Design a protein with these regions (language model features):
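Transmembrane helices of ABC transporter permease
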Residues: 10, 14-27, 129-183, 254-267, ...
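ABC-type nucleotide-binding domain
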Residues: 326-579
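Conserved catalytic Walker-motif region of ABC-type ATPase nucleotide-binding domains
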Residues: 96, 218, 306, 335-337
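Helix-loop-helix
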Residues: 47-54, 147-161, 231-305, 309-310
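Alpha-helical segments in transporter systems
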Residues: 2-5, 13-34, 55-59, 74-78, ...
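An intracellular "coupling" helix at the cytosolic face of ABC transporter transmembrane type-1 domains
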Residues: 10-13, 98-102, 118-127, 131, ...
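Helix-loop junctions and hydrophobic alpha-helical segments within the transmembrane domains
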Residues: 92, 96, 205, 306, ...
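Transmembrane helix-loop-helix hairpins at lipid-water interfaces of multipass membrane proteins
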Residues: 9, 15-72, 76, 149-154, ...
Length: 579
């Protein structure tokens, strides 16, 4: 947790003043029982109305100053805690953006969301309560004991005993509940995971009529979380009854012993009332301290989870900002004996892959599900690093390019068409912030998207809702293709990004890309044989191995895997027409 405290930087003054003002409030609070004692022993005893009114005015003044001090402390602590949370959230978001796909795969999206939201909120609340109560509660306990000792050293022993007993009760309850709270936080991760899976895959769930099964799985996970929270809540609920029972018994003992002391003339009635008030102050402070410890314990657990992400350093280092000279005449992409295995996977996803793509070529990539098509493309983009072998673009190892230059060099259209809230123009300018309307329209024409964009009110200024939900699947795919074309990359990757397009639009798209993107190397990843058959050469993958690398006609004669794919999608007559 101490590693996270660097995020308080910039709010040191507020973090210092908050506990100081809380201690100032505590000082005034400690004087209240003495003023009440003086009212009883002097004002009421002597029937001195003026004295009573004067002391009542003093009580109001003490309350007003205490309130002002408390509000000031609350403002300072809230400012520091909110600033701390904002800085931590910003840095965590930035850090997650630096992680490679390997680290993100290992951590998982649901737990990242939980740590970015719930865990940081827990840490933020812990900081807020710490600034307010860490010094105040012990100060009140110690101050009340000193005040009680100044009134009656003998009865102070009772105070010390009660303080120890209440502290032991609080410690015992926390010792049991803290691990349960930690497990509950992990349970929240699992609930978040199931929720995300079901919302993202809602159509699939309904298509297979799995609503009841998914509901049953969610109910089971949610019930487990509920049981953990109930268990912690039931045990925590014992704290107030037990502590109040002990303190009330102590008050009874104090009244009995105090009455004896009053009869003996060793104490006044006002002093006994003051002792009872000090005991109440000790109880409330210990309970607040217990709340603080529970909150801090949760914050520590959440802080460890946040730190776990911050301490996860990417294995994929950016070589820097230096620009490499790109030789346009060199091979656009070259794989040499590349092998890659996903983290914790039992077998390689790609094995001994070797091929060459020249500038201006269109390369088709085809294979069955799980054959390694997307993995191969991810290595071109350097979303992952190969375990063995080398990947080179334009005569430079892909690892030598800075991430910024590599992203300009390679335009990617992923399988899932993702648009962002804003306008069509905003989305088109993601990779090229200074792109003109002419450049955007040119990209839209190539992507077969210009017609429906012109039909939108506002055209380029037409709004895009969250995830592009106000566009159809085919429209989203065409817009993401246009977005990748705007900066005119030297390599364009279409990773099964035309799956929602009809055959005519798909064919028009491939023709436009071929004719309008002179010198651009295009990788078309698809499960459709029709989408890749006109490529200059086609890479055929089967279970992570490259089993074919040739034009369509040659593969039909030499590659059984490719032939099976074609015959599974086309009749023999249709296949014959493609030769």
């Amino acid at each position: 947790m101490h590693k996270l405290m660097r995020y308080i930087k910039g709010y040191e003054k507020q973090a210092l003043l908050a506990p100081l003002f809380k201690m100032l409030e505590a000082c005034f609070e400690l004087f209240v029982p003495l003023v009440i004692a003086s009212i009883i022993d002097t004002g009421i005893k002597n029937e001195d109305a003026a004295f009573i009114w004067t002391r009542c005015g003093l009580l109001v003044l003490l309350a007003a100053i205490g309130l002002a001090s408390s509000l000031t402390a609350q403002w300072f602590s809230a400012t520091a805690a909110l600033g701390f949370g904002a800085a931590l959230r910003k840095d965590l978001f930035r850090h997650i953006g630096t992680l490679s796909y390997s680290e993100l795969d290992g951590i998982g999206t649901p737990t990242l969301v939980t740590r970015m939201t719930s865990d940081i909120n827990q840490v933020q609340n812990g900081v807020n309560l710490t600034l307010r109560l860490l010094l105040r509660s012990p100060f009140i306990v110690i101050g009340a004991l000193i005040m009680a000792f100044s009134i009656s050293p003998k009865l102070t022993l009772l105070f010390i005993g009660i303080t120890i007993m209440v502290s032991l009760i609080i410690w015992a309850i926390m010792r049991v509940t803290v691990p349960i709270y930690h497990e509950a936080q992990n349970g929240l991760d699992r609930v978040t995971l199931l929720t995300r899976e079901n919302y993202v895959g809602a159509r699939v769930v309904r298509a297979f009529a799995r609503q009841a099964d998914e509901l049953a799985a969610f109910v089971e996970t949610n019930d487990h979380l509920k049981k953990l929270q109930f268990a912690a809540g039931r045990i925590s609920a014992l704290m107030n009854p037990l502590t109040y029972l002990v303190v009330n018994l102590a008050v009874v003992a104090l009244l009995l012993r105090g009455g004896v002391e009053v009869d003996a003339g060793k104490l006044t009635q006002g002093e006994v009332i003051a002792l009872i008030n000090y005991m109440s102050q000790i109880l409330l402070s210990l309970l607040r301290l217990a709340d603080l410890v529970v909150s801090v314990t949760r914050a520590l657990a959440s802080g460890m989870r946040v730190n776990e992400i911050l301490n996860t350093h990417t294995t994929m280092q950016d070589p820097g900002t230096a620009e490499l000279a790109v030789n346009d005449a060199a091979e656009a992409a070259k794989f040499e004996h590349v092998t890659f295995t996903y983290k914790d996977a039992g077998a390689p996803s790609l094995t001994d892959i070797t091929f060459t793509a020249r500038p201006g070529e269109t390369i088709g990539v085809i294979g069955g599900t799980g054959s390694g098509k997307s993995t191969l493309i991810d290595l071109v983009c350097r979303f992952y690093d190969a375990d063995n072998g080398g990947v080179a673009l334009f005569d430079h190892d892909v690892k030598q390019y800075s991430f910024a230059q590599l992203r300009r060099l390679v335009g990617v259209v992923p399988q899932q068409a993702v648009l962002f809230t804003g306008t069509i123009r905003d989305n088109m300018q993601w990779a090229a912030p200074g792109a003109s309307d002419e450049e955007i329209w040119q990209a839209l024409e190539i992507a077969q998207a210009a017609e429906f964009v012109r039909g939108k009110p506002g055209m380029l200024d037409a709004p895009v809702e969250t995830a592009g939900r106000n566009f159809s699947g085919g429209q989203r795919q065409r817009l993401t293709i246009a977005r990748a074309l705007v900066p005119k990359p030297k390599i364009l990757i279409l990773d099964d990004s035309a799956s929602a397009l009809d055959f005519a639009t798909d064919a028009a798209l491939r023709k436009a890309i071929k004719e309008e993107t002179h010198g651009m190397t295009v990788f078309i990843v698809s499960q459709r044989a029709a989408s890749v058959q006109r490529a200059d050469h086609i890479l055929v993958l089967d279970d992570g191995k490259l089993v074919g690398d040739a034009p369509h006609a040659e593969l039909l004669r030499s590659c059984e895997v490719y032939k099976e794919i074609c015959l599974s999608q086309l009749s023999k007559e249709e296949v014959a027409k493609t030769l």
